[in-house]
């Protein structure tokens, strides 16, 4: 058994529903290349391909250019703040948030072209104007973002990469926690949702040892139940049908 900080061990065991889930915090996992695997799945339908070819260029961020001093400049209409969702999948959560909060600008990062095609169709159908997209590696986007630029970062049901040799592909790494701390405003939040206990434990262990973040949970229901206004994704509904319960973790950026 690996010995880790008592505070980390206790809370990880809680998230594991009293199963002992131990994470070796002495093992350093370095980021080498992309956090993602394959980038293309099923062949796109004709209209989907047309959206990728013609609508995406108008919404896509070009990180070859310098980032604006204020991310609000990326949006046609004035926005009060900017949020980021990493790996939005089919876009259910991101679209619901964009519609519910027209005063907020949203950036969605997704490397898979099929997911990008799905969200483009929703953006076109509902004439959504407060979303910009990045079709690439979120690590590169994080490096491009200006400091203190984001109000919130969401990571909803990410690929858990369960095999040990693939852990370096998980988004939650010390390097990315540092990048999020740089990009978030003081009091901003990183929100994480997963139905995989080992990835919840991994995330909690990493964030608890990060001096820039504070776990906001005060009672079990704070992580057992979705936060107010949360939109369940297609994957989340599938997990529930199969008997897997998600955890909903929220971490606040501590003022520097």
UniProtKB/Swiss-Prot annotation:
S-adenosyl-L-methionine binds at residues 85, 110, 137, 159. It comes from the Bacteria. It catalyses: guanosine(46) in tRNA + S-adenosyl-L-methionine = N(7)-methylguanosine(46) in tRNA + S-adenosyl-L-homocysteine. Pfam families: Methyltransf_4. InterPro entries: SAM-dependent_MTases_sf, tRNA_(Gua-N-7)_MeTrfase_Trmb, tRNA_methyltr_TrmB_bact. Substrate binds at residues 163, 195. Its EC number is 2.1.1.33. Catalyzes the formation of N(7)-methylguanine at position 46 (m7G46) in tRNA. Belongs to the class I-like SAM-binding methyltransferase superfamily. TrmB family. This is tRNA (guanine-N(7)-)-methyltransferase. The gene is trmB.
